[in-house]
UniProtKB/Swiss-Prot annotation:
Protein name in UniProt: Isoleucine--tRNA ligase
Reactions this protein catalyses: tRNA(Ile) + L-isoleucine + ATP = L-isoleucyl-tRNA(Ile) + AMP + diphosphate
A GO term from the CC aspect: cytosol
Cofactor(s) needed by this chain: Zn(2+)
């Protein structure tokens, strides 16, 4: 027998290298075959509900890192709730209707307008489902646990029927109406857009300053007066029907030198405009409040048959322009509101493709709206006072990336104004994990207009509206419920397969259709109405979920998207918000903080991370960042996270190896019988348990990450495990000292594995497979540990906090000795301590081998003052010299008692007593010398 075989060197097959990329899929298959998700739900039946409702990603293409961050975050929350006494099923979902899928088919050569609509919709459905399958595998590969075989998909018959019923309830309450209000219009998509489908970019536009001649000054202005107007959308002058001024803004009537004409502009802007127009020696003839100019009549700059009325509007400012804006009710929300209130015509001079129509005038007809500036300038003639190019923030179609326009077209709207206050009141009841999120959503609802819910596309859920022969819209409780039942049985495609009369209840009549003829609506619903109905299609309709949901967790862009639409439809139907809490996340940026873009080549695909590092590293990264704000990710950042993972893994491997001969049922030492240092580590660990439990409850992943890494690096690696080898390797295998420490090791190992499970389920299960004494066959079926409290724990914490300060001072003294070449490593040291009474009391209180704690071979606590040259601190001083004696071949300490034993071992007296007691046969035979 060799001497080193008398050491209790930890033994384990748990690999140092994780091999995550190859092992994770194997484990995931094992979990699926073991039906772990289903077993977890069965275990939690009857417990309090926790419903995290999954916001549906759009089913198009493989997932990106933003998807991964979101789904991993949800998985961590659901797993932690499932292990904390909650019934927390997770139903993943997908959003499947809308323009992107139509665009994909178009790129594939499918010509929608040249084929049967039903066949086209079947192609859309087929493609959408293929993308659901693709993304499902992507999400499962991340280790996300959920009911993957029974997800919700917005194109399924049951979901579409639920959506129709949401619409029906809103129609019954009078919230659905048809109007020709201006809406965001995408000429590139040939469809209206919702606010959530808009993004803003800088756009270079031509702005014009021009003048309208006064036709009827109402006794205030003469007819040789011109009112100066500013516009950044010259094409809308073709539909201008009024000029709007601010009621409380001061305006001046001026005449520049050399001009026969008089002009009206905002007083505050006169100086800057005079410079812009080249006016000199401007004479101010009069000053008016805006309300004095109300109802003055001017003439359209080139269409003299059109009068333009001066009206009042709150939206007019003196921040830029002239303080007067031309008003085209067909091309702007503010214009529409003040225009209709004053009886102005709602003229629309641009068609759905952005082409100017005949009513714009023969010079404009057929031109693209954005190309008419030269024609407008020509028509204005000497009424044009100035032009300039400006860069301003402008709305774009978020899918086609093309600028959009406001355009009044007949659309279906969901009223928000009719129950706005009710929505705002519900927002006050929701818990927002970011206060700014509450403000953002509140302001959006407060300021938003009614919701245009109709779209002029094909792939979507039809609006369940019929028209009588006289054009009267029909959407009764009876007709809508009948459509819902048809969709539930056949899917919404039946709308396109059948004639209107075959979609109505049998025997249905209407006074507007004396001949029994009906038409059906051809517009579909906004996709935000699809996903915004999920609270009904999923949370209400799935028996395992509970409405309202406890939590919605999505990106911060969803304040204008899913959070918004879900809130409106839920309050409209039931008077309550669909969620109790909102947690929002920022965007994933590259390592430099730049937005990820395929064109920039700075994207990171989750699949690439899985191949190089494993999904576990992506999961750990999610906890390492504050995802309430924008976060950074790169392969370099992931390498750093991987290094942290390696430290966690190797620390736990040490615990596994050094408890391999520990049977918790037989070998556990009661807390009261532990050494002070072991009690301290137990108390510290339970502080960690509480911190992590609380952080899981508050969805504070970064807190978990920091607390866990700090405990492993500082409490374990840099302290407890640093001197542990002197106990667990060297003392007798069954000695009290070793069992005391193993008790702490095992407790930490089991509980930290459970605490890690929501974040690192693959690694946790791998560790669990080595814990043969634990009852559950999978750690995912266990519960998170509860934090314990202990008698005198504050006293223990205070004692050891003081000792850690003392230890830091001792380490500085040892470091100085090392630098002076007195010693090499600390085990070569004889440390002499010169304590005051406080430190002397402290050293007596730790009831442990202080030399062992400081990892020195010899320690002396001296009486009296410290000699000259000692390393001194306020309460203590140290001297360091090389320890006397020889190195023990077994414990590696330098000890005066180290000697050649008659059984061929050069060991100290302490090791000799251990060897002679535990290895009598080897002592009798003598140890091998080679």
């Amino acid at each position: 027998m060799k001497l080193k075989e008398t050491l209790n060197l930890g033994k384990t097959d748990f690999p140092m290298r994780a091999g995550l990329p190859t092992k994770e899929p194997v484990w995931q298959k094992e979990w699926e075959e073991a039906k772990l998700y289903q077993r977890r739900q069965e275990l939690n039946q009857g417990k309090p509900h926790f419903t995290l409702h999954d916001g549906p990603p759009y089913a198009n293409g493989n997932i990106h890192v933003g998807h991964a961050m979101n789904k991993i975050s949800k998985d961590i929350i659901v797993r932690s709730k499932s292990m904390s006494g909650f019934y927390a099923p997770y139903i993943p979902g997908w959003d499947t209707h809308g323009l992107p899928i139509e665009q994909v088919l178009a790129k594939q050569g499918v010509k929608r307008k040249e084929m049967d609509l039903v066949e086209y919709l079947k192609l859309c459905r087929e493609y959408a489902l293929s993308q659901v399958d693709k993304q499902r595998e992507d999400f499962k590969r991340l280790g996300v646990s959920g009911d993957w075989e029974n997800p919700y998909v917005t194109l399924t018959p049951d979901y579409e029927a639920a959506q129709i019923r949401v619409f029906g309830e809103m129609a019954k309450k009078g919230y659905i109406y048809r109007g020709a209000k201006p809406v965001y219009w995408s000429w590139s998509s040939e469809s209206a857009l919702a606010e959530a489908e808009i993004e803003y970019h800088d756009l270079l536009s031509t702005s014009l300053y021009y003048a309208n001649r006064v036709k009827d000054g109402k006794g205030v202005l003469d007819t040789d007066t011109y009112i100066v107007v500013w516009t950044t959308t010259p094409f809308t002058i073709t539909a201008s029907r009024g000029l709007t001024v601010g009621a409380d803004i001061d305006y001046v009537l001026v005449q520049p030198a050399g001009e026969s004409r008089k002009f009206v502009v905002a007083s505050e802007l006169l100086n800057s405009l005079s410079e812009k127009f080249g006016w000199a020696d401007v004479q101010v003839l009069a000053t008016y409040r805006g309300q004095e100019l109300n109802h003055i009549v001017t003439v359209h700059p080139w269409d003299t048959a059109v009068d333009e009325l001066v009206i009042l509007g709150d939206h007019v400012t003196t921040d830029s322009g002239t303080g007067i804006v031309h008003t085209a009710p067909g091309f702007g929300e503010d214009d529409y509101n003040v225009g209709v209130a004053n009886g102005l015509e709602v003229a629309v001079t641009v068609n759905e493709r952005g082409i100017m129509m005949e009513n714009a005038g023969p010079e404009f007809a057929g031109q693209f709206y954005d190309k008419v500036v030269p024609t407008v300038i020509e028509k204005l003639g000497d009424l044009l006072l100035a032009q300039e190019e400006i860069s301003h923030s402008y709305p774009f179609d978020w899918r086609t990336k093309k600028p959009i326009i406001w355009r009044a077209v007949p659309q279906w709207f969901a009223s928000v104004s009719k129950f706005r206050q009710e929505i705002l009141d519900e927002i006050e009841k929701v818990k927002f994990h970011s206060e700014w999120g509450k403000v953002r959503l509140y302001n959006m609802i407060r300021d938003r207009g009614d919701w245009v819910i109709s779209r002029q596309r094909a792939w979507g859920v039809p609006l369940p509206i019929f028209y009588a022969e006289d054009g009267t819209p029909i959407m009764t409780v009876e007709t809508i419920e009948h459509v819902a039942q048809l969709f539930e049985e056949h899917g919404s495609i039946i709308w396109w397969e059948r004639d209107a009369k075959d979609l109505l209840p049998e025997g249905f009549t209407h006074p507007g259709s004396p001949n029994g003829e009906f038409k059906k609506e051809t517009d579909i619903m906004d996709v935000w109405f699809d996903s915004g109905s999920s609270w009904n299609g999923v949370v209400v309709n799935r028996p395992e979920l509970k409405y309202p949901a406890d939590l919605y967790l999505e990106g911060s862009d969803q304040y204008r998207g899913w959070f918004n639409s879900s809130l409106i439809t839920s309050v409209a139907n039931h008077g309550v918000a669909p969620y109790k809490q909102i947690l929002s996340q920022g965007f994933a940026l590259d390592g430099k903080g730049e937005k990820m873009s395929k064109s920039l080549g700075n994207t990171i695909a989750p699949s690439d991370v899985e191949k190089q590092f494993g999904a576990e590293i992506l999961r750990l990264w999610v906890t390492s960042v504050d995802s309430s704000n924008d976060v950074r990710i790169s392969m370099d950042i992931l390498s750093q996270v991987s290094e942290t993972y390696r430290k966690i893994r190797n620390t736990l491997r040490f615990l596994i190896a050094n408890t391999s001969d520990f049977n918790p049922a037989e070998d556990t030492v009661a807390y009261e019988e532990l050494r002070s240092v072991d009690k301290y580590m137990t108390v510290r660990f339970n502080q960690l348990v509480k911190t992590i439990r609380d952080a899981y409850a508050d969805f504070e992943f970064l807190t978990i990450y920091k607390a866990l890494v700090n405990f492993i690096n500082v409490d374990l690696s840099a302290f407890y495990l640093d001197f542990a080898k002197d106990v667990v390797y060297i003392e007798g295998a069954k000695s009290l000292e070793r069992r005391q420490m193993q008790t702490v090791f095992y407790d930490i190992l089991v509980k930290i594995t459970k605490l890690l499970t929501p974040i690192l389920p693959h690694t946790a299960e791998e560790i669990w497979s080595y814990l043969e004494f634990e009852a559950e066959d999978f750690v995912q079926l266990s519960e998170l540990p509860e934090a314990e409290t202990f008698a005198n724990q504050e006293e223990i914490l205070n004692t050891w906090a003081a000792f850690m300060d003392f230890r830091g001072q001792a380490q500085k003294a040892l470091e100085e000795a090392r630098n002076a070449k007195v010693i090499g490593k600390s085990l070569e040291a004889h440390l002499t301590i010169y304590p005051n009474e406080v430190v002397k009391t402290l050293l007596g209180a730790v009831d442990s081998n202080v030399a062992q704690l400081l990892i020195v071979s010899e320690l002396t606590i001296a009486e009296g003052g410290a000699p000259e040259g000692a390393v001194s601190f306020e309460d203590v001083a140290f001297t360091v010299e090389r320890a006397a004696g020889e190195v023990c071949d077994r414990c590696r300490r330098i000890d005066p008692t180290t000697a050649e034993r008659n059984y061929h071992a050069v060991i100290c007296d302490h090791c000799a007593s251990i060897v002679e007691e535990n290895f009598a046969d080897a002592v009798a035979e003598g140890f091998e010398t080679k």
